[in-house]
């Protein structure tokens, strides 16, 4: 699942990327 911040930034932040991989 893509996080809101992921879509807005279009670039996964370190924390966002980690959460993305966890989901």
Swiss-Prot record:
<protein>
    <recommendedName>
        <fullName>Protein male-specific 40</fullName>
    </recommendedName>
</protein>
<dbReference type="GO" id="GO:0005634">
    <property type="term" value="C:nucleus"/>
</dbReference>
<keyword id="KW-0963">Cytoplasm</keyword>
<keyword id="KW-0539">Nucleus</keyword>
<dbReference type="GO" id="GO:0005737">
    <property type="term" value="C:cytoplasm"/>
</dbReference>
